[in-house]
UniProtKB/Swiss-Prot annotation:
<dbReference type="InterPro" id="IPR002403">
    <property type="entry name" value="Cyt_P450_E_grp-IV"/>
</dbReference>
<keyword id="KW-0256">Endoplasmic reticulum</keyword>
<dbReference type="GO" id="GO:0020037">
    <property type="term" value="F:heme binding"/>
</dbReference>
<dbReference type="GO" id="GO:0001768">
    <property type="term" value="P:establishment of T cell polarity"/>
</dbReference>
<dbReference type="GO" id="GO:0042573">
    <property type="term" value="P:retinoic acid metabolic process"/>
</dbReference>
<dbReference type="GO" id="GO:0045580">
    <property type="term" value="P:regulation of T cell differentiation"/>
</dbReference>
<dbReference type="GO" id="GO:0006766">
    <property type="term" value="P:vitamin metabolic process"/>
</dbReference>
<dbReference type="GO" id="GO:0004497">
    <property type="term" value="F:monooxygenase activity"/>
</dbReference>
<dbReference type="GO" id="GO:0062183">
    <property type="term" value="F:all-trans retinoic acid 18-hydroxylase activity"/>
</dbReference>
<keyword id="KW-0472">Membrane</keyword>
<keyword id="KW-0503">Monooxygenase</keyword>
<comment type="similarity">
    <text>Belongs to the cytochrome P450 family.</text>
</comment>
<dbReference type="GO" id="GO:0071300">
    <property type="term" value="P:cellular response to retinoic acid"/>
</dbReference>
<dbReference type="Pfam" id="PF00067">
    <property type="entry name" value="p450"/>
</dbReference>
<dbReference type="GO" id="GO:0001822">
    <property type="term" value="P:kidney development"/>
</dbReference>
<keyword id="KW-0443">Lipid metabolism</keyword>
<dbReference type="GO" id="GO:0008401">
    <property type="term" value="F:retinoic acid 4-hydroxylase activity"/>
</dbReference>
Length: 512
């Protein structure tokens, strides 16, 4: 018994020694990791590097970021201030909040900073994209792509977008159970990108498979760039390969069949604009370009669409005020009419309250956290040095949350953007849902157009109610969205705002 007791004590002592050793090893390695990055400060600059933590060796604070969501940024901003250092997705990073700080970064493109997304994002989107290009190449690509989002182009997309949204809402209303809004919004924006923007005639079965693959691609765009079996990065690479193969097939079929088209889609305009600028696009450039267009139209717009529906659910007075505006303009149309082309750009631009609603959704629920840059030369920001070679992320969402020009920043209040109040008029960098400077989002007008049409159709043709007791928690990765997707039951409305019976709804769906 004595020896057995000694064996137990010995085992516990050994275990305790191991735990102490591991703890000490982690503490020492973490301290060395901090010193490793502290040594990269620019010795010629007397200012200190921003405060913050670099986390653990190699992984940094990526785990904390993924688990804490919005709490990660807010807790560190509270502890370290508007400019702090961290280590995310395999690289050192300085996160920046505040209009003046963000302005310096956005206006410093090409001489202080240059765009650089995380390595996983760069590799998965491809080298031929607008977002990954710099300097003259970036300027030339923006000129080519700008034709896709011109006023004339948006006017030609509008009837098709409206019809896709009408069909989708009709399907949601005819569904006997509640739907997952975020998942369905992703399908809607994906369908819009494929059918309307790119003009691809992909069979429904193939489109469903392509959507699943694209979902896998998007889920891993922001992942640790570690190419190992079963890693998120490897899954993203595999999804990209499948997508590229499917896109090449669709592009070749589209180029061979040009008959019977009643409008020029984005891919047509991209090819045409490229030729106008003296360049013939290669197949690889076309594949990367279409992949980027889908990415731009898909994830962020689905996020904003879900946020729009959630806020209309939370604030019925906003929805009713929106309906009043539509009635005043004579466009609160019948839910039983699938007519295409009843909206025009000038009509939408005249809906002032609708514009305020969309702006407030984008202020309070900006789909992406911010943008990434790499530092070309050391500069000063908020009393700290931002060393050459480091990465910087300017925070859109936190800049909105801390902007002094907005009263009651956490309250959903569309009237803050009304002509009477115009809280966004003081300082252009307090409100920047689409970024700013030379890299302002090219597709921002298309995104706002889509959201406005969706809001008009929701107010005109649908009643909807939350199918759960409480509203879900919000997560931020890869874009802002409800953790459960937002479960909502939809009901169709007729021209008198009366609920359409399920049998009638089914008959209407069958005629489309």
């Amino acid at each position: 018994m004595l020896f057995e007791g000694l064996d137990l004590v010995s085992a516990l002592a050994t275990l305790a020694a191991c735990l102490v050793s591991v703890t000490l090893l982690l503490a020492v390695s973490q301290q060395l990791w901090q010193l490793r990055w502290a040594a990269t400060r620019d010795k010629s600059c007397k200012l200190p590097i921003p405060k913050g933590s670099m986390g653990f060796p190699l992984i940094g604070e990526t785990g904390h970021w993924l688990l804490q969501g919005s709490g990660f940024q807010s807790s560190r901003r509270e502890k370290y201030g508007n400019v702090f250092k961290t280590h995310l997705l395999g690289r050192p990073l300085i996160r920046v909040t505040g209009a003046e700080n963000v302005r310096k970064i956005l206006m410093g493109e090409h001489h202080l900073v240059s765009t650089e997304w995380p390595r996983s994002t760069r590799m998965l989107l491809g080298p031929n994209t607008v977002s990954n290009s710099i300097g003259d190449i970036h300027r030339n690509k923006r000129k080519v792509f700008s034709k896709i989002f011109s006023h004339e182009a948006l006017e030609s997309y509008l009837p098709k977008i409206q019809l896709v949204i009408q069909d989708t809402l009709r399907a949601w209303s005819s569904h006997p159970e509640a739907i997952n809004v975020y998942q369905e919004a992703q399908k809607l924006t994906f369908r819009m990108a494929i059918r309307v923007l790119l003009g691809f005639s992909i069979p429904e079965e193939d489109l469903g498979h392509l959507f699943e693959v694209y979902q896998q691609f998007v889920d891993n765009v922001f992942s640790l760039p570690v190419d190992l079996p079963f890693s998120g990065y490897r899954r993203g690479i595999q999804a990209r390969q499948i997508l590229q193969k499917g896109l090449e097939k669709a592009i070749r079929e589209k180029l061979q069949c040009t008959q019977g088209k009643d409008y020029l889609d984005a891919l047509d305009l991209l090819i045409e604009s490229s030729k106008e600028h003296g360049k013939e696009m290669t197949m690889q450039e076309l594949k990367d370009g279409t992949l980027e267009l889908i990415f731009a139209a898909y994830a962020t717009t689905a996020s904003a669409s879900t946020s729009l529906i959630m806020q209309l659910l939370k604030h019925p007075t906003v929805l009713e005020k929106l309906r009043d505006e539509l009635r005043a303009h004579g466009i609160l149309h019948s839910g039983g009419c699938p007519c295409e082309g009843t909206l025009r750009l000038d009509t939408l631009s005249g809906l002032r309250y609708l514009d305020c609603v969309i702006k407030e959704v984008m202020r309070l629920f900006t789909p992406i956290s911010g943008g990434y840059r790499t530092v070309l030369q050391t500069f000063e920001l908020d009393g700290f040095q931002i060393p050459k070679g480091w990465s910087v992320m300017y925070s859109i969402r936190d800049t909105h949350d801390t902007a002094p020009v907005f009263k009651d920043v956490n309250v959903f209040d569309p009237d803050r953007f009304s002509q009477a109040r115009s809280e966004d008029k003081d300082g252009r960098f307090h409100y920047l849902p689409f970024g700013g400077g030379v890299r302002t989002c090219l597709g921002k007008h298309l995104a706002k157009l889509f959201l406005k049409v969706l809001a008009v159709e929701l107010a005109s043709t649908s009643r909807f109610e939350l199918a759960t007791r409480t509203f879900p928690r919000i997560t931020l990765v890869p874009v802002l969205h409800p953790v459960d997707g937002l479960s909502v039951k939809f009901f169709g409305l007729d021209s008198n705002q009366n609920e359409i019976l399920p049998e009638t709804e089914a008959m209407l769906s069958a005629t489309v």
